[in-house]
Amino acid sequence: MIGCSLLSNGQQISREELIALTPLWKGERFPDGRPKVPDSILDRMKLVTLEEAWAVLRNENYKHQYDGNWQTINPDSVLVGRAVTAIFVPGRPDIHRVIDSFGVRDKRVKSQNSWPIDLLVKRDVYVVNQFGAHEDGPTIGDNLGNSIYAKTGNGIVYDGAIRDINGLKE
């Protein structure tokens, strides 16, 4: 999922767009078009080191695919899963109202920051770009974090404000 695609469905690109963006995937797909990487591959990936994964990406000419300096809440665990990505651009009241109207039209509930969470399934990893915003932007706390974990059994990668760290560690 790529967030803020206003022309398609509020904050979700269409199945057709997602398939067009991932033409090399020949395996099974979720109903929304996302590639459904087999659980057996996800299990094997838990054994791959960061250096091994990075070497494969470099050899396939995937450049600029690594960003370090993340805060790790559970350093003894390995985070592997199917990525569901969202981008939240800095807020503008005029655009926010329009996107909210799309949510009403699409019968979405709650606020915009919960919409991508509604798409999550077991073994997903929620990957969010909030541009590092710590003021006036969505945050992940223990309520949303627990909702994400209940749906996925997994953690998150989040470039934005995190609160309730102790609740998230539990």
Regions found by a protein language model. Name each.
Residues 3, 34, 145:
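Short, flexible, solvent-exposed loop/turn segments with mixed acidic/basic and small polar residues
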Residues 1, 23-27, 115-118:
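Short hydrophobic/aromatic-rich motifs at helix boundaries and adjacent loops
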Residues 10-11, 15-17, 22-24, 43, ...:
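Mixed-charge, polar/low-complexity N-terminal
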